[in-house]
């Protein structure tokens, strides 16, 4: 029998229970993968993450929350989220304010669903067009990549969090 993602995470009464969460999280730690959670409507997506987070915090003696990650190469990659041009396309504008705005929208959409870590464009230089990740970069110009990297980090963090300048 084949089940869709919603059928797999809800019990027979249509509830997302602690028992269901325990199947995802052994001993309150580890890496969780919910399959095609990203295909779920925003409310369902958020409900699942919130229930899992509650379980993890309550089941470990230090109350340490889990980190949820999400792809944000050109907007948050999830059902109903905003999609923007690719990183290399955004870089071609040389518009750092635009890039900051793009990633502030992605951050808002991710936070609204409980996602705490964003996988974003590659800040390495694309020196060889044969590299499979070239389209996920801001290009080959060090000055441009640095400016776009700072703008994307500022957008994601809202300018309110310190970041390690050695890695931007």
Q: Where are the language model's segments positioned?
A:
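Glycoside hydrolase catalytic-domain context in secreted enzymes
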Residues: 1-168
